[in-house]
């Protein structure tokens, strides 16, 4: 995203330790935004983000990520297609447990295929220690990083809202209402603060999970918690980390093509389910401009800060929804 790009640019200026203090500032702003959402209520958010805005934003979340999937897949298209086809077959034809893990099946088949053709170097796995704790960076206070990072928060906050609505569509549950958007936003903020204080990587909502849930139909939050704990446990095993790093980019790219396309399809389904009338010129303009600004790579720069991608497009959609007069003849 544009926000992540800005973070990496500032890392070069303020150093990684200084950037960590900026992340704490981002988490703090997230917390303040969650209080605002709590104060104004769900109705306020739904007025800002009606289906005509949320639908194309979800589509954009998927399509904006598609480029990275293609770039990874094109390193070895045959291998990427093997992984993609395996995931599709497991999802459509698999039974029982096999149908619940199509992504894992695609990665395993792709990995084994790559091994068969000698495309994987197992030397780093053999040389890696069994136990290797992740390296953290001791943060340091940099007011310049803090001041810069505060406005950067706008983009990920908007993306957070879009991701929550996307997961709503996939699961059929209303997470905006229960546990509440203010709580999900606060959780994101607290995670950023903790990451900044211990010198770890920044965190945000992860769109790929939405695609995975859409494919597997597993909507129990307990599964996500188990996956999170498993990830933490695996992080201290050096050989596991090395093995995961050895997975060819093309294999992951093939899987991502399916995941990102699924997210875009969720957005299209959102427009259909909410009966968004694209025969209405107002709705057509809002949807069209959100998509063209996002896919076209439009960006606005001011004061060294860049607003682009999903953040800019969603903000544009909110603005158009508020200022364009509603049709008197069409719903």
Locations of the language-model features?
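Membrane-embedded helical hairpins/re-entrant loop segments and their flanking transmembrane helices
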Residues: 151-221
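Helix-loop-helix hairpins and the membrane-proximal interhelical loops
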Residues: 103-182
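Membrane-embedded alpha-helical modules
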Residues: 17, 21-124, 228-331
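Juxtamembrane loop-helix boundary motifs flanking transmembrane segments in multi-pass membrane proteins
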Residues: 37, 58, 81, 129, ...
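Membrane-interfacial loop-to-helix junctions in multi-pass transporters
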Residues: 51-54, 78, 138-146, 175-184, ...
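Short, small-residue-biased leader/transition segments that mark boundaries at the very start
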Residues: 1-8
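Interfacial segments of multi-pass membrane proteins
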Residues: 9-12, 91, 209-224, 230-234
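Hydrophobic alpha-helical interface/terminus motif in multipass membrane transporters
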Residues: 10, 45, 66, 167, ...
């Amino acid at each position: 995203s544009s926000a992540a790009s800005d973070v990496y640019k500032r890392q070069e200026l303020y150093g990684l330790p200084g950037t960590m203090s900026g992340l704490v500032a981002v988490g703090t702003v997230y917390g303040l935004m969650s209080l605002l959402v709590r104060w104004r209520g769900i109705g306020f958010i739904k007025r800002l983000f009606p289906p005509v805005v949320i639908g194309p934003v979800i589509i954009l979340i998927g399509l904006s990520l598609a480029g990275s999937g293609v770039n990874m897949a094109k390193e070895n298209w045959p291998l990427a297609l093997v992984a993609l086809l395996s995931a599709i077959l497991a999802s459509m034809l698999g039974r029982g447990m096999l149908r619940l893990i199509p992504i894992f099946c695609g990665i395993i088949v792709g990995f084994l295929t790559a091994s068969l053709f000698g495309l994987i170097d197992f030397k780093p796995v053999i040389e890696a220690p069994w136990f290797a704790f992740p390296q953290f960076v001791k943060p340091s206070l940099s007011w310049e990083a803090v001041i810069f990072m505060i406005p950067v928060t706008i983009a990920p906050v908007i993306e957070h809202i879009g991701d929550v609505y996307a997961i709503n569509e996939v699961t059929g549950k209303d997470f905006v209402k229960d546990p509440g958007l203010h709580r999900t936003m606060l959780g994101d903020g607290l995670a950023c603060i903790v990451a900044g204080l211990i010198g770890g990587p920044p965190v945000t909502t992860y769109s790929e999970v939405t695609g995975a849930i859409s494919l597997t139909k597993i909507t129990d939050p307990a599964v996500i918690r188990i996956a999170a704990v498993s990830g933490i446990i695996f992080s201290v095993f050096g050989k596991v980390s090395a093995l995961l790093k050895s997975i060819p980019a093309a294999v992951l790219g093939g899987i991502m093509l399916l995941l990102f396309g699924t997210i875009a399809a969720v957005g299209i389904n959102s427009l259909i389910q909410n009966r968004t009338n694209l025969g209405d010129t107002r709705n057509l303009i809002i949807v069209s401009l959100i998509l063209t600004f996002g896919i076209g790579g439009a960006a606005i720069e001011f004061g060294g800060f860049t607003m682009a991608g999903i953040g800019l497009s969603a903000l544009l959609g909110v603005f158009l929804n508020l200022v364009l007069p509603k049709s008197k003849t069409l719903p």
